[in-house]
């Protein structure tokens, strides 16, 4: 669409060469299962998916190596899964000065044993990187550390850790590289919960967040105990 001073160009999954057949099939199924959300998430129409936790993100094709050289600070997180839930490892450049997060890499696979996780980490040249991982899996963390991931560490978990992490992420401008298809999907489907009357609750649904959880872990050193007046999610509907 265009006007006197505005030019808007809409792209959809049909324009993204990075998407695999399985991901495309999922988007096409969304058109049938949830056409209201698919209008935004799949067809690119104006608006937002209702109840989204994060509205502060975009998908942009940036030069990864150049961005790393410019800013210099990369962050990595890991969430563990196996049969139904995936093991994830997102990588991002964090621009602390400008409050921007540039997500450029992702691992998203089910059925990974520790040896296979090590192999995936090696492929990404992250064996020596600091990786903040899910504290609920101390045995897996110990195995990975023993097998060469010397700088993997358990993320801190407390009564407010999820809330603090999400609030901090909401304060950033988040850019996602189009090659990170699972990350894009999660940011487009991670929503707040509702009660039986349809009222929005002050907590997200615990789903579609395997990469998002790992991103929270990766950023934990940048947020601490928040003042009481800030201990709330930012809900904008």
Where in this protein do the model-derived segments appear?
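Mg2+-dependent endonuclease catalytic cores in nucleic-acid-processing enzymes, primarily RNase H-like
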Residues: 90, 97-204, 225, 229, ...
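Acidic, Mg2+-coordinating catalytic module of metal-dependent nucleases/exonucleases
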Residues: 206-226
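Hydrophobic/aromatic beta-strand patches that form the interior of the parallel beta-sheet core
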Residues: 7-9, 76, 132
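Gly/Thr-rich phosphate-binding beta-strand-loop-beta motif of the actin/hexokinase/Hsp70
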Residues: 69-94
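ATPase catalytic-site recognition across NTP-hydrolyzing enzymes
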Residues: 16-78
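A residue-level signal for conserved active-site and pocket-lining positions in enzyme catalytic cores
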Residues: 11, 42, 89, 131, ...
